[in-house]
Amino acid sequence: MKRFDLRPLKADIFERLEELIKKEMQPNEVAIFMFEVGDFSNIPKSVEFIQSKGHELLNSLRFNQADWTIVVRKKA
């Protein structure tokens, strides 16, 4: 399982998220992505983004006051 920190990107996480899934993960591999909560708009957007790409969202939870994590399985 890999862990990727997207917090430095603030709200602009989706391009990097897609790049990491494509290039850094193997099919059926699970990874944890951490990003900054901000105004909470990235939380539902991240769920929709993962599902629209055909990947499986295993978990989505608040990590602390400022950060959120999603656990994703890459599609085969």
Across the structure, where does each feature detected by a protein language model lie?
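Amphipathic alpha-helical interaction surfaces in cytosolic regulatory modules
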Residues: 15-21, 39-57
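Generic cytosolic/nucleocytoplasmic N-terminal low-complexity/intrinsically disordered segments
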Residues: 1, 44, 52, 73-74
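C-terminal edge-of-domain segments
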Residues: 54-76
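Long, contiguous binding/interaction regions
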Residues: 26, 30, 49, 60-62
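Glycine-rich repeat segments that build the extracellular carbohydrate-interaction surface of secreted
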Residues: 30-36
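Helix N-cap motif at beta-to-alpha junctions
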Residues: 38-40, 75-76
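An N-terminal amphipathic alpha-helical segment
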Residues: 1-28
